[in-house]
A protein has these predicted regions:
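N-terminal Rossmann-like FAD-binding beta1-loop-alpha1 element of flavoenzymes
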Residues: 3-29
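Short hydrophobic core segments
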Residues: 6-8, 196-208, 345
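Active-site substrate-recognition segment that forms the wall
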Residues: 16-24, 33, 44-52, 83-88, ...
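Dinucleotide-binding Rossmann-like beta1-alpha1 core, especially the glycine-rich loop
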Residues: 46-135
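Helix-loop-beta segment of a Rossmann-like dinucleotide-binding subdomain
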Residues: 54-55, 83-94, 120-166, 266-270, ...
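Short beta-strand to alpha-helix junction loop
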Residues: 61-67, 99-101, 147-163, 275-279, ...
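A conserved short coil-to-beta-strand element within the FAD-binding core of flavoproteins
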Residues: 173-187
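C-terminal catalytic lobe of FAD-dependent flavoproteins
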Residues: 298-379
Length: 379
């Protein structure tokens, strides 16, 4: 078995890499150790949240461009497949409950006008006294008003992944239930004993990429990144699909289509049971119900836990592996991957085909490797 491009990992990043590769005519294979969308990408939240508009830099500009371009790409996937991705630019509400937060938010309003180019894009970051819909969020959560961010959006993670998969099925060979084991001289071995000759291999299997980097570059997995546990829940509640998502003190409340509301999430550096929910999620649910009384009595229909990849330098990790010119790492992203996966994937394909993509310096593998050396004192 052979291909131009082998993608390791069937999450949102891997699917977008495969889609861009197929669109460019590359013979592509995607392998996934479990099933496509079974990892962190197949969660519940689907929040597409911009960075703060102040202290503008290349990373924030990259994300802004990605969030701005995503609606058109989602529509294209939906038209091709006939599947709904559950995308909506719903905006975000952030209650202000400290004077210091209100002062900072006022400065961010001006920054958004400039950096989000409000006069042309229409995207705003404004302070208002009352929410667009009474009780969303609760009045006692916002004694100083709230910020309304109109750039933020939401997408249904599982519907999105299903549509992306459908969009590539006729052009990409998808192999599920087989994991990456090793790669040497352009031949990848899978856990089922398959040997795949690949001109280029993309490592995009989330946190499971970090042990592979340790295997190929030396050192342990933690030298390159680590998994961070997140827990979330899905509630049943008939609410207006247009309601903005609410973010307050680390808690998200996101209305999705079909009478569902996603709530989350935890961010756990230490954990014993990575895929089990516990009292930490109960705490998040309690906060969410107080924050948005409309879901106070909404029944929980699903509890979810998963592991997100946090690279050593926190930002996405992209680059050709040292001494392995045919292997490209494409992982990380942590909490922002869903909103930028399509743009990162395009850059990765550019890199794999001899191009020179414009990426923030902090995204490059070389930057992460320097960060890792600095943190371990091996300057």
């Amino acid at each position: 078995m052979s291909c131009d491009l082998l993608v390791v990992g069937g999450g949102v990043f891997g699917l977008w890499i495969a889609r861009h590769a197929a669109q460019r005519g590359l013979d592509t294979i995607l392998i996934e150790k479990d099933r496509v969308g079974s990892g962190a990408s197949g969660g519940l939240l689907g929040a597409l949240i911009p960075h703060l508009p102040e202290r503008w830099d290349a990373k924030k500009k990259f994300q802004f461009e990605a969030l701005s371009s995503l609606p058109g790409l989602v529509r294209a996937v939906e038209e091709e497949t006939g599947l709904d991705c559950g995308y909506r630019r719903c905006g975000r509400l952030m209650p202000l409950w400290k004077e210091s937060f209100a002062d900072i938010a006022a400065k961010q309003t001006a920054a958004a006008q400039q950096n989000w180019n409000t006069s042309e894009t229409g995207f705003t970051w404004e302070i208002v006294e009352r929410p667009p819909s009474e009780g969303w969020p609760a009045a006692d959560a916002m004694p100083l008003g709230l910020v309304v961010d109109t750039l933020a959006a939401r997408i249904d993670p599982r519907s999105y992944l299903a549509a992306l998969r459908r969009s590539i099925e006729s052009r990409v060979r998808i192999i599920e239930g087989e994991a990456f084991v090793a790669c040497a001289d352009g031949v990848v071995e899978t856990s089922a004993g398959k040997r795949i000759m690949a001109a280029r291999t993309m490592l995009s299997s989330g946190y499971e990429t970090f042990p592979i980097l340790g295997q190929m570059l030396g050192g342990d997995a933690a030298s390159y990144g680590r998994p961070v546990k997140g827990q979330a829940a899905l509630l049943e509640a008939e609410l207006d699909d247009d309601l903005p998502l609410v973010f307050h003190d680390g808690t998200y409340v996101i209305v999705h289509d079909g009478g569902r509301v996603a709530v989350g999430s935890t961010s756990e550096q230490r954990f014993d049971a990575p895929f089990s929910t516990d009292a930490a999620l109960d705490t998040v649910l309690d906060k969410a119900r107080r924050l948005c009384p409309a879901i106070a009595d909404a029944p929980v229909i699903e509890r979810w836990a998963g592991l997100r990849p946090r690279a050593i330098g926190r930002n996405p990790m992209i680059g050709v592996l040292p001494d392995h010119p045919d292997i490209v790492v494409a992982t990380g992203g942590f909490k922002i991957t869903f909103g930028i996966a399509h743009k990162m994937a395009e850059c990765v394909i550019d890199l794999a085909t001899g191009g020179a993509p414009e990426l923030p310096e902090s995204f490059w593998l070389s930057s992460h490797l320097k960060s890792g050396k600095s943190k371990t004192g091996n300057n």
